[in-house]
């Protein structure tokens, strides 16, 4: 029998984390009342924390790309997100996987943090580029969008630390094996 790259448990973990991230960030956005700074920071903090924990749990090349694909499909099908976000999300994930490989691979202890950092950075940069293309008639609007994304990125940077802390606690509890 042929051994598959991802086993069933890892695929379930990726799917559960993708769905959890979408549900929790949507609840935070709805409870926060829109684009206020606290909900932006908290939403990105939770997203990055869960992504770091996922990358510690499933340490294989392609896990982030698969997570990104499942997350984008959930967003498209269930939440009515635009289909135009799927290519940029996949491209961001693939570039991040390349960055992780260039910095030593997935088995390194710092690989999940590097992956989450680069994924957030690349995906937010890609989102800003798409936003600029959409509002090129009034380029002054992009400065407001940059401010909103920068506030959210603060939460992403904080999420790196909380993700490492949560992964360490889950490792001590025996939930994360490596």
Protein language model regions, located:
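Membrane-interfacial segments
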Residues: 28-32, 36, 58, 62, ...
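Alpha-helical membrane segments and adjacent membrane-interface helices in multi-pass membrane proteins
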Residues: 39-98
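Hydrophobic alpha-helical transmembrane segments
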Residues: 11-16, 41-45, 61-69, 86-87, ...
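Short, Lys/Arg-enriched, disordered terminal segments
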Residues: 1-8, 172-178
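Membrane-proximal helix-loop-helix units in multi-pass membrane proteins
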Residues: 81-131
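Membrane-embedded alpha-helical hairpins and interfacial helices in multi-pass inner-membrane proteins
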Residues: 109-178
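Hydrophobic transmembrane alpha-helices
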Residues: 2-62
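Aromatic-anchored segments of alpha-helical transmembrane domains
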Residues: 18-26, 70-79, 116-126
């Amino acid at each position: 029998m042929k051994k598959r790259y991802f086993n069933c448990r890892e695929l379930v973990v990726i799917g559960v984390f993708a769905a959890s991230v979408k549900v929790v960030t949507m609840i935070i956005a709805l409870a926060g009342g829109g684009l206020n700074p606290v909900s932006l920071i908290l939403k990105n903090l939770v997203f990055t924390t869960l992504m770091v924990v996922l990358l510690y749990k499933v340490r294989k090349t392609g896990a982030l790309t698969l997570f990104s694909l499942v997350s984008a499909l959930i967003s498209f099908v269930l939440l009515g997100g635009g289909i135009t976000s799927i290519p940029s999300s996949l491209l961001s994930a693939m570039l991040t996987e390349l960055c992780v490989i260039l910095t030593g691979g997935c088995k390194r202890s710092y690989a999940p943090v590097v992956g989450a950092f680069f994924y957030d950075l690349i995906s937010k940069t890609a989102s800003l580029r798409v936003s600029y293309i959409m509002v090129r008639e009034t380029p002054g609007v992009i400065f407001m969008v940059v401010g909103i994304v920068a506030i959210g990125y603060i939460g992403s940077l904080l999420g790196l630390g909380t993700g490492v802390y949560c992964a360490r606690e889950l490792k001590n509890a025996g939930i994360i094996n490596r």
